[in-house]
Design a protein with these regions (language model features):
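Flavin (FAD/FMN)-binding glycine-rich loop and adjacent Rossmann-like elements that form
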Residues: 1-209
């Protein structure tokens, strides 16, 4: 609504992670109280690490994928995208160096295997449809006569000043109406995916993709 969008992320992979040592810690996710990201963030050696966002997934033996770090980017601006891609690669290297420093048993012999070909964009243009799903709808667990799906994902907004809302309890969900996929004033047209008609906070939930 204001033109301010969520942060982007350039995903990356590490290879030659020690399988045994990594099995002892399980992951380096932000939620782990002794995750190395808590030492990396704020360390002057890693100035591009501006928050503690870190998700990791074991892809294969010694091969780890990361959705980690944030880069400010406007995906409608080619220059901004280019700058974000360059900064994202530098950020991936800094995160790897931090993992080597603070979790050397697992990452000491690892190397940066790849960075994504495209910037991960969480929020960009959305299409104005016959109905706009809002934060209030999410909070109310609203049902719709034209519901075509259900969602229970939390409000996951990647902004440092974002308001945090309580997650749904087990078994709770809301409906997703067909009318937030049909562009206003058009016929025989349907939109789906990130451009779904929502407000910014509701988008933080509906944008989510299962792993």
């Amino acid at each position: 609504e204001s033109g301010s969008v969520q942060e982007g992320t350039l995903c990356f992979t590490l290879s030659n992670v020690d399988p045994y040592e990594f099995s002892l810690i399980g992951n380096v996710h932000t939620n782990r109280t002794n995750s190395p990201i808590h030492s990396i963030y704020g360390n002057p050696k890693y100035p591009l690490v501006k928050d503690k966002h870190m998700n990791d997934k074991l892809i294969g033996p010694g091969f780890l994928g990361f959705n980690a770090g944030h880069v400010t980017v406007d995906s409608t601006d080619p220059a901004s995208l280019t700058e974000a891609m360059m900064k994202g690669r530098k950020l991936a290297r800094q995160l790897h160096e931090g993992l080597v420093e603070f979790e050397p048993k697992s990452f000491g012999a690892s190397f940066l295997a790849s960075t994504a070909n495209l910037m991960g964009i969480r929020e960009s243009r959305r299409i104005k449809c016959d109905y706009t799903f809002t934060l209030e709808d999410w909070l109310a667990r609203k049902e719709f006569e034209d519901g075509i799906g259900r969602n229970c994902y939390y409000i996951d907004v990647h902004k440092q000043d974002a308001t945090v809302y309580p997650r749904y309890k087990k078994g709770e969900s809301h409906g997703i109406p067909f009318s937030c996929l049909t562009p206003a004033g058009l016929k025989n047209v349907m939109v789906a995916g990130r451009c779904i008609s929502t407000d910014s906070y509701a988008h933080g939930s509906l944008r989510g993709m299962p792993p």
